[in-house]
Every structure is written in C-alpha cells, then in structure tokens.
C-alpha cells in the first residue's frame, strides 16, 4: 500500500476540490494513459487494485507509471462513539484528483492492448476517466 514515510502534520482537514488539474495533466513518460474527467479521492487500495489489473492484462509486455500518490490522511472515529473527544485516528490515505489529472501511463504495448488494460483499471477507480495517447496532447499544442 502506498503511503508517505513521514508527514509534517498527522491529520489534515478534508478540504474541497475546485477547478481543474494544473499539474500532472499531460503524458510525461508513456505513450498511453488514463486521465480523470471528474474529481474525487482515490485511496491507496484502489490505486493498487488498478495497478494489479493493468499488470495482469499486459503481463510482462510494457512499462507502467503511477502518476498519483496518496498523501492525504483520512481519519475515522470508531463505530458507536459519542461525538467529541477529538479527531479520529488515521484510517487510510487518499490522493486528491481533479479533472485533467493523468493517473496512469503505459508504454511498450500496442494501442489496442493499452486501451483494454486502462479500461480494466478504470473499473477499479471511483472517478470517471478517459483514455489518452501522446498524439492527443501533440494535437492540443505541445507538451512542456
């Protein structure tokens, strides 16, 4: 499971997700990827499930990059606990995802195989996604 080794603050506020992704919104490493079209929290377990789904499908064919990291702690209080007595303990970690964020990148396989692998991975994720290729970003006006 992905989680930070050390954090500055053990517990953080929930916050809100506004706007589109301004960073991590283009393909940096691979030829294919999946890009979020809605916002949401993706847990470390969901990232791992998607990674396994992709790797099982492509076998030893290509290279996979995970472009998101769960760095936000989510706290929960135990069941049937009265209100008050402080914030709950950290239960799991999430990555905050905004529309436009590239979640996974893949190279070393053909487009048809990459499309199916990303489709399988997208079923494991709580956000809507779309399949993107390097060609899509070159048509839009280049990369950084």
Swiss-Prot record:
Q: Which HAMAP family match?
A: Ribosomal_uL16
Question: What is the name of this protein?
Answer: Large ribosomal subunit protein uL16
Q: Which organism is it from?
A: Clostridium perfringens (strain 13 / Type A)
Can you name one GO molecular function term for this protein? Answer: tRNA binding
**PROSITE patterns given for it?**
RIBOSOMAL_L16_1, RIBOSOMAL_L16_2
Q: What family is this?
A: Belongs to the universal ribosomal protein uL16 family.
Any single biological process term in GO: translation
Listed under GO cellular component are: cytosolic large ribosomal subunit
Q: Does the keyword Kinase apply?
A: no
Q: Which CDD domains match?
A: Ribosomal_L16_L10e
Stated role: Binds 23S rRNA and is also seen to make contacts with the A and possibly P site tRNAs.
Q: Which Gene3D superfamilies match?
A: Ribosomal protein L10e/L16
- Keyword hit for Plastid: no
InterPro entries per UniProt: Ribosomal_uL16 (IPR047873), Ribosomal_uL16_bact-type (IPR000114), Ribosomal_uL16_CS (IPR020798), Ribosomal_uL16_dom (IPR016180), Ribosomal_uL16_sf (IPR036920)
| This protein's UniProt keywords | Ribonucleoprotein, Ribosomal protein, RNA-binding, rRNA-binding, tRNA-binding
Subunit: Part of the 50S ribosomal subunit.
């Amino acid at each position: 499971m992905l989680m930070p080794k050390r954090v500055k603050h053990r517990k953080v506020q929930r916050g809100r997700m506004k706007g589109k992704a301004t960073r991590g919104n283009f393909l940096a490493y691979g030829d294919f990827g999946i890009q979020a079209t809605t916002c949401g929290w993706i847990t470390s377990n969901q990232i791992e499930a998607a990674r396994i789904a992709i790797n099982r499908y492509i076998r030893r064919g290509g290279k996979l990059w995970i472009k998101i990291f769960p760095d936000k702690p989510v706290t929960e209080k135990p069941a049937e606990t009265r209100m008050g007595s402080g914030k709950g303990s950290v239960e799991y970690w999430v990555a905050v995802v905004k529309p436009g964020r590239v979640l996974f990148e893949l190279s070393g396989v053909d487009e048809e195989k990459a499309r199916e692998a990303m489709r399988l991975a997208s079923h494991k994720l709580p956000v809507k996604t779309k399949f993107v290729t390097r060609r899509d970003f070159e048509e839009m006006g280049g990369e950084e």
